[in-house]
């Protein structure tokens, strides 16, 4: 009988024991994933590790006062959640725009947007959780000459006009 009343799913031979929920311990993340100079990525969820079909998830660490090279992630959408530290994001064809995010903040990066992550702290590692809209990591490193002074951009919530900025 269908679990949700609408779709029937074949019960796997193990009754979901090993093919259902997966818990990936933080000390078993895979650093053998696409990298960008200036940061360390580690995969938790992808096709090879858990059979994910539509997402990739992992962690990103950027050392104090360090920055990544400019890059984009092809057709993928990315969500970055700041666990600790302060992120300064630059984006655009010449990295001409800038915004900052801190613990508890989310960052959305649309497909093909050239961007750069910067640890805005000189003494704290920037630690983030990263989720992408495909099961494999796609990173296209770019050779961009950034503008000297990027333009600050504040986000305006299109739904809750008096809410977040």
Predicted regions mapped to residue ranges:
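A short beta-strand-loop-beta hairpin characteristic of the jelly-roll/cupin
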Residues: 67, 76-103, 113
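Short glycine/proline-enriched turns and hinge-like loops at secondary-structure junctions
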Residues: 53-55, 73, 101, 120-122
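Conserved metal-binding segment of the jelly-roll/cupin
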Residues: 62-65, 91, 101-121, 131-133
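A short hydrophobic beta-strand segment most commonly corresponding to one strand
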Residues: 57-60, 79, 108, 123-141
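Short, charged/polar surface micro-motifs in flexible loops or helix N-caps
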Residues: 49-53, 63-67, 84-88, 137
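Short, glycine/charged-enriched secondary-structure capping and boundary segments
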Residues: 96, 122-124, 143-146
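A short, N-terminal "cap"/entry segment at the start of jelly-roll beta-barrel domains
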Residues: 1-54, 69, 139-165
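Short strand-connecting beta-turns/loops that link adjacent beta-strands
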Residues: 49-50, 75, 94, 122-123
């Amino acid at each position: 009988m269908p679990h949700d009343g609408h779709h029937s799913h074949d019960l796997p031979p193990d009754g979901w024991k090993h093919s259902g929920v997966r818990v990936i311990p933080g000390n078993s993340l895979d650093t053998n994933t696409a990298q960008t100079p200036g940061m360390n990525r580690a995969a938790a969820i992808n096709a090879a590790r858990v059979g994910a079909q539509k997402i990739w998830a992992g962690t990103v660490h950027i050392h104090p006062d360090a920055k990544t090279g400019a890059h984009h992630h092809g057709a993928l959408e990315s969500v970055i959640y700041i666990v600790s530290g302060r992120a300064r994001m630059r984006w655009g064809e010449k990295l001409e725009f800038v915004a900052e995010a801190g613990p508890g903040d989310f960052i959305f990066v649309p497909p093909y947007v050239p961007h750069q992550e910067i640890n805005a702290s000189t003494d704290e590692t920037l630690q983030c959780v990263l989720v992408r809209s495909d099961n494999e990591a796609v990173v296209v490193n770019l050779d961009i000459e950034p503008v000297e002074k990027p333009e600050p951009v504040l986000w305006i919530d299109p739904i809750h006009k008096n809410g977040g900025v």
